Amino acid sequence: MVSHFMGSLSVLCFLLLLGFQFVCPQPSTQHRKVPQRMAAEGAPEDDGGGGAPGVWGAWGPWSACSRSCSGGVMEQTRPCLPRSYRLRGGQRPGAPARAFADHVVSAVRTSVPLHRSRDETPALAGTDASRQGPTVLRGSRHPQPQGLEVTGDRRSRTRGTIGPGKYGYGKAPYILPLQTDTAHTPQRLRRQKLSSRHSRSQGASSARHGYSSPAHQVPQHGPLYQSDSGPRSGLQAAEAPIYQLPLTHDQGYPAASSLFHSPETSNNHGVGTHGATQSFSQPARSTAISCIGAYRQYKLCNTNVCPESSRSIREVQCASYNNKPFMGRFYEWEPFAEVKGNRKCELNCQAMGYRFYVRQAEKVIDGTPCDQNGTAICVSGQCKSIGCDDYLGSDKVVDKCGVCGGDNTGCQVVSGVFKHALTSLGYHRVVEIPEGATKINITEMYKSNNYLALRSRSGRSIINGNWAIDRPGKYEGGGTMFTYKRPNEISSTAGESFLAEGPTNEILDVYMIHQQPNPGVHYEYVIMGTNAISPQVPPHRRPGEPFNGQMVTEGRSQEEGEQKGRNEEKEDLRGEAPEMFTSESAQTFPVRHPDRFSPHRPDNLVPPAPQPPRRSRDHNWKQLGTTECSTTCGKGSQYPIFRCVHRSTHEEAPESYCDSSMKPTPEEEPCNIFPCPAFWDIGEWSECSKTCGLGMQHRQVLCRQVYANRSLTVQPYRCQHLEKPETTSTCQLKICSEWQIRTDWTSCSVPCGVGQRTRDVKCVSNIGDVVDDEECNMKLRPNDIENCDMGPCAKSWFLTEWSERCSAECGAGVRTRSVVCMTNHVSSLPLEGCGNNRPAEATPCDNGPCTGKVEWFAGSWSQCSIECGSGTQQREVICVRKNADTFEVLDPSECSFLEKPPSQQSCHLKPCGAKWFSTEWSMCSKSCQGGFRVREVRCLSDDMTLSNLCDPQLKPEERESCNPQDCVPEVDENCKDKYYNCNVVVQARLCVYNYYKTACCASCTRVANRQTGFLGSR
């Protein structure tokens, strides 16, 4: 029975085995060949020799965007086809591929593994196999077989050794795995080897979906980096130097919300350059086909801003490794950006709360920004800039004409400097801004008491018109927005400026309100179109002088030009805008900068006029009116207008019918000689009387009247028809702040003996905001640190921590620590008082060979800035490179990846004790014949409180005599009045201003002497 059963079972097994052979045939030799070898065997022999020229096919469709917001990347490719393919009547370039039926057609190369090849073992980079010994795999307790050779496969799969000290110091502790990393088990490795033979043929199809999201693709940590410090006892992977961070690195946690959609509903996490398939691979021939040009191009997409609560794309990629053990334990990862430029597109992640980071992937997802604040993004592991056309690597920028990728030929730049020496006060025209101007920049060369003004051609004042000074800000005019800037009067030397993007929709005139010598006004704007011309030469320019860097020849005589310049030199913003071009002097001046534009001959030249008819005695010159008055009030000028008329009919005829030599010369005639209405001239506000809190500010308001192109100060009653502006106003620069103790005293820093305790003291404004300490009175600052006594300590050895730095920056050195025998109240004992078991004070260290390492070099500290109390010390910190026997000083940017030592520190010396403090001496009570001056003297302790511990013998005097000389007026030959109306300056009490004190020196000095004598007599 048993034998029968066993026989049946044998037959059944034989049938099953035979059926399995038919169902699952063994893979043939052809299937095990790599694609390159298959293509080589299937191609006929090439008798051509070199690479055959090809033709580009049409661009394929754009791939899906690699990001859903904040700027992703799309990819577009085109195939390189053999030239004979088009000649044989094959499919047009860009059509679906049928030319090579046995090959997979892909738009881009398949995705590359981020960490290791299929046969690569997780070896520690930088460690010899002979020295390594049994290597412990991360996340596994199974040692590596001794006979297994570690291979690199290719450069992108290996990691270079990172020497200790380059990114900091420290060790990553080895901890037993909390969870077995199944990705590195030997069984998993064997399965990968068995399946790797089919992976290449399936790679193209599997890569069509691009990068999978972190939820779908289990991320693997990058390899651990082990140093070359020699063999150790025990497990070789127990300790390994890794990327170390500076001590001051931020250890905050990122936001928990995700930037992307859930993996179940979206696959946009990594779809980018690796997400599409290649349009055409090379033909299955041994001869290569080459095409000249770009095979693929990238474009920016989905530039809409991500929600504020979303995490950055680097945070999302680093967080995907949170659920994978690293060296036996789990970490939370955050981006680490303090790397050099060529590594900005690697996925470097820092373990939160620890001072090391790991390169988790060689490439970030396409579309990831290279820098936190930069505009370049990463594509295929390379940092590429974004052109103005949104194409990556196009290097196109917007030229000065506003054209993307333009060559600056679509517009003209008009610029110059207004340097005319002005003599009279008031408005003077600087330049005309034509219609359609862009990139307008009108700037004083340096600060002065003059003001810039702007008016439209229609007569509307835009900025600083009608003798009123506007505050800096934005003003709309001419169809654009002008930014009026007036730099701070104390901290800046720059002058006023008008800035506008344009374009303007009407002609605008720029004026200067002249009050002191002209420092020069630079003007520049852009005119679109190649036939644009410059504005009319300003009236202050004489014929034959260079204008805007070009010598311009005017079409009128020098006398006429000078006379017209004198007539137009002074203009009032309240009146009608003078015409820039008249029928007699209309001209154009092409302005082109050297090396940027070439002068051209105008296309609209007027042909020669026909010969006029012969003059006769039937016509003569007659005055037919006058020109408009140059001003509406205050004495202007006008000229008679002469026309050619018929003697009998007095009808006007062409000027060619009259003898031009007999035409009378127009002479200037006065007009509108009545004075202009008086107006209030408003000055600028003075500085606020208080630096914080409510204060007062003042300004000067004068009644002025214009007559004969001069602005005169008149009695205030002439402006009584106008409401007088305010001369004083309240002001508040900022809110006053005070010191606030935010926390209680902390516990003592030592368990016994004398230590320190601290508390938080902040400068807080009256609305509760924390501000800089300079906002509060530093003399009233409460102490934030004090000593504390925790009782006596037992006699014992006291040790400090080992020094963080090795005595040698490279090579062999030592690290040291302090060892002292201490007892009650931290008093020192002889070293033998604690016994003979004294701990070691030095230990060896080695930072690797000296091969041009870059480091910070700090000099010695200077002496304390004060003799007692708290002060500061300084030292030099430079970036150097240590060679064999020399040091090379480098630019500080070369050491930017290293933590820079402080160049300043506080120092505390002995307390100063109570000392006498005094104020400055007051003004003398009399200017002559003996007066006195006083000051306050106080005795203050170290905390700036009143004290009675000062030596009375050392108390400074509180009163002393002054000005014992006789009251004889001293005559200063250089102190004179420059203006005849300085008595008005004295009456208006303007001598407090330096300008009027200098211009009216004699009058202001007499008033000052009278006031001093009056005070002294009292």
Swiss-Prot record:
SMART domains: TSP1
Subcellular location: Secreted, Extracellular space, Extracellular matrix
Main location: secreted
Domain of life: Eukaryota
Domain PLAC: 971-1008
Biased composition (Low complexity): 201-210
Compositionally biased region (Polar residues): 259-279
GO biological process entries: elastic fiber assembly; microfibril assembly
Keywords annotated in UniProt: Aortic aneurysm, Extracellular matrix, Hydrolase, Repeat, Secreted, Signal
Domain TSP type-1, residue spans: 53-307, 676-737, 739-792, 793-851, 852-911, 912-968
Signal peptide bounds: 1-25
Function: Promotes FBN1 matrix assembly. Attenuates TGFB signaling, possibly by accelerating the sequestration of large latent complexes of TGFB or active TGFB by FBN1 microfibril assembly, thereby negatively regulating the expression of TGFB regulatory targets, such as POSTN.
Protein name per its UniProtKB record: Thrombospondin type-1 domain-containing protein 4
Species in which this protein is naturally found: Homo sapiens (Human)
